[in-house]
Amino acid sequence: MRIIIVGCGKVGSALAEQLSAEGHELTLVDLSERRLEELTNRLDLTAVAGSGTSYQVLLEAGVQDTDLVIAVTTHDEINLLSCLTARKASGCHAIARVRDPQYVADLGFIRDELGISM
């Protein structure tokens, strides 16, 4: 499966390690070139420096050919916007890490109308 992970913090790094071990084709997107370099030195994956909310960055990451986008930054809004942009760009599946109870209350709308899993 071709997967784009937005965010290379603790969650994104752990997710990349697990999915890489399972044999998935990964592309990581993060603002930190240092974090991306650390992961590309350890894992077989592609890295793109930039914001996951940027349509151009997602295109560079190969969103048009990806199966799944998982956004796991520390910011709920960035995760939701990254997933929404990816869904509109390619129709791929999208999962956003969301911690704010406000968004959890809107889960049905976000899932059914925006097509984003949380």
Where are these regions (language model features)?
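Cytosolic regulatory regions of ion transport systems
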Residues: 1-118
